[in-house]
Amino acid sequence: MKAISDVFERVARASCVIKLAHAFLSLALLAAPLSAQVPPDESWRTLETDHFRVTFPAELEAMGRRAAGIAEKAYDELSAEFIEAPGGMIDLLVTDHIDQSNGFAQVNPSNRITIFARPPVDDPGLGYIDDWMELVITHELVHIVHLDRADNVVGKVARGVFGRVTGPWPFFPGTGTPRWITEGIATWYESDLTEAGRVKGTFHEMVLRTAAIEGRFEDIGQASGGSPQWPTGTRPYAYGSLFFDHLLTKFGEDRMAAFVEAIAGQWVPYRLNAAGRDAFGVSLSREGELWGQELYEEGMSLDS
């Protein structure tokens, strides 16, 4: 009996260690940059809709209520045209405490979106917008809908047992994909579901056409890498969104959902070309090469 008791005691200790390690890891990974920290002494207000818990400073109540309406509209549109949005409440924080135009989304420990309300005035990549709040809320909500997805049995069981663990496969397979995929999908839908968006603008097209003509066009693997060289942080947004635009124009807009579901359902993760073949019938690497050649030929024809 003592041996059995010792076993249970060791298991209990191990369980406590795992829980503590997970807690500390989650805190470390969830630590946001200083610019993203909101003032805790603000006079915050919160309202709830069917799918969102919207928080905002008291003086921005009109904007907060408008953001709630935009979010619900985008939620319905994405559920109809992309994939089914996740259940449960999504936290949406709207703030103007810093002079920055941005937003970010996270799926751990719950689905959360933060929006910086200042509209962009100095970013050429964000020059083609109609309504900043509509564009940025739609973009960040796409991240939630996309990255929350886990269709493989291992992931569903793991999340049921361990909760929303911070990590890619099997918990959140989409978070383990390159940025040209995550940002490309969100940028494509921001353009498809609003009156503007970066796919409809000319800046990203100019970036890629110039790269193709000058022999600097990057393959899709390189497009996710960080570099101080122009176009710096624009790279995954421009390459990703316009490559998906190429794929969906060629193979059909319904293929985006099939691609996301293929990644979310993989038993052996990180096989992007396999997911591409499942969804589009082609290898993404090979199709990316053909796409680059098309852009080169188009650019040269305009230059002649």
Name what the model sees in each region.
Residues 1-17:
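N-terminal secretory signal peptides that target proteins for export/translocation
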Residues 19-32:
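Bacterial N-terminal signal peptides
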Residues 36-178, 226-229:
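Juxtacatalytic substrate-recognition/specificity segment
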Residues 37-48, 52, 72-73, 231-235, ...:
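Beta/coil-rich, acidic/histidine-enriched accessory regions frequently appended to metallopeptidases
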Residues 74-79, 181-194:
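An active-site-proximal "capping" alpha-helix that borders the catalytic cofactor pocket
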Residues 141-157, 185, 191-203:
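Catalytic Zn2+-binding segment of zinc metalloproteases
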Residues 188-218, 253-261:
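Short helix/loop segments within enzyme catalytic domains
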Residues 217-240:
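Catalytic-site signature segments of enzymes, centered on catalytic residues
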